Amino acid sequence: MEFSAETLRQQLGKYKFRDLTIEELKDLNRTFPSFIFSMETYTFRDGSQKDLLNLTGTVPMKHQGTTYNIPICLWILDSHPFAPPLCFLKPSGNMGIRVGRHIDAQGRIYLPYLQNWSHPKSTVTGLIREMAVKFEEELPLYSLSAEDGARQRELLSYIAQVTDGVSSMDVKAPSRAKVTVIGGGDMALACLLAVSAKGTAGKLLLLDPTDGEAAGGAAADLEIFSLPNVQVTKDFSAIAGSAIVIVTVNSWSNSQSYVGVLQSNVELLRGILPAVAHHCPKCLLLVASQPVEIMTYATWKLSGFPHNRVLGIGCNLDSGRFRHVIEKLADSEEGAQGAWIIGEQSDNKVAVWGAPDSSANRQTPCKLYPKIFQEQLTSRALEILKGKGQRSWSVGLSVADITDTLVQNKGKVHSVSALCKGQFGVQEEVFLSIPCVLGSAGVTGAVQTLQDEAQIWETLQRSAAAIESVQQQLRL
């Protein structure tokens, strides 16, 4: 390509050593004229972004008498030439990455030349020459067979998400949103740690609304033993910009009646949700407080949000466990995709067989077992799962699973607490767990179950009536 020093000078306006960088790139252009320069957005591991100079091109080399052109991508940091570039392979869909001494599974390139980088001895031109030498010793890429092509395209998408950075020119950078967890107890900490481990959030915030230290043990511990990208606060203004707000607050007292405890929870929400709605008017609310159906309903009413942006964790954990057991019993992952636990998160929940995960990225249809076999599998699976509780850590993993789908806009199906009026013959304004398609807009659709037995409908309708009866006793 034609080299334009003036264009580069304008693009590198924020670079500390712009003139030195331009002179070095002139030399690179003379030696490797096929490299293309462009300013692209680089996403770091912590979710922060910076506009950096991106170089894409090929490294010519020979291996066993055959000439190869290895596609690479270099990111030139704004402290160049005193800091080495970040280097990645850039394989096409029919290429596989060969992990070796200098290449990791994500295509990141590691060379002694980079480790020993020292200006003015080290240059980008010298780096590419070093790559050619090392690539001749060990080819970094290999040709895929046709049947591996589809898997490789998925790999490339994955690589783009887990490497230090990715050019938006090739693959859209994964969303790494700000996520807030509200609460100060074990449930809040479990959700926070699970979401952090999932890697979905660029920034995590724990907002502890409790007064004093008694109820805020988890928050206090996090202030002592801090975690990267995690902020602990009592200031509601700090949650501004959160894409997801996870509600875990609960108030339990042995001296109160059941309705009294629920009313205490409602009052907690009343003191929290107006501030959430003010600072995060576009966020999604994910409720993990118990009982989740009633607390999700109260959150919906008190927040004033559209019902599609308010959901509860529902039976997502139960459904995941149920499908896992079905897979083991039937020795088939494919056959468990249509198995769901729905309804009320209590002894009244029911197992159903419905449509498979209808997300856009699933191409394999669900295997439909004969009804008698479905019943046998269901009975055996529920027997195995009997007595399996919902401890904080397991609920936290379920919350992280849902959060990942919402933030990444996966269009994946989860059994979550959603407004159920008009489905399964339910006429009440209640939230029950049903298979829903989730994305960045919240609940974007519901999956129609294949079973319409009267017994299932009656169970859901009884749950809806009982829940509404309690809701009518609450002051909202």
Swiss-Prot record:
SUPFAM superfamilies: LDH C-terminal domain-like, NAD(P)-binding Rossmann-fold domains, UBC-like. GO terms for biological process: carboxylic acid metabolic process; protein modification process; protein transport. Pfam families: Ldh_1_C (PF02866), Ldh_1_N (PF00056), UEV (PF05743). Residues 2-145 form the UEV domain. GO terms for molecular function: oxidoreductase activity, acting on the CH-OH group of donors, NAD or NADP as acceptor. NAD(+) binds at residues 185-213. InterPro entries: L-lactate/malate_DH (IPR001557), Lactate/malate_DH_C (IPR022383), Lactate/malate_DH_N (IPR001236), Lactate_DH/Glyco_Ohase_4_C (IPR015955), NAD(P)-bd_dom_sf (IPR036291), UBQ-conjugating_enzyme/RWD (IPR016135), UEV_N (IPR008883). Transmembrane segments: none annotated. Disulfide bonds: none annotated. Gene3D superfamilies: Lactate dehydrogenase/glycoside hydrolase, family 4, C-terminal, NAD(P)-binding Rossmann-like Domain, Ubiquitin Conjugating Enzyme. Keywords: NAD, Ubl conjugation pathway. Homodimer. In the N-terminal section; belongs to the ubiquitin-conjugating enzyme family. UEV subfamily. In the C-terminal section; belongs to the LDH/MDH superfamily. Possible negative regulator of polyubiquitination. This is Ubiquitin-conjugating enzyme E2 variant 3. The gene is uevld.
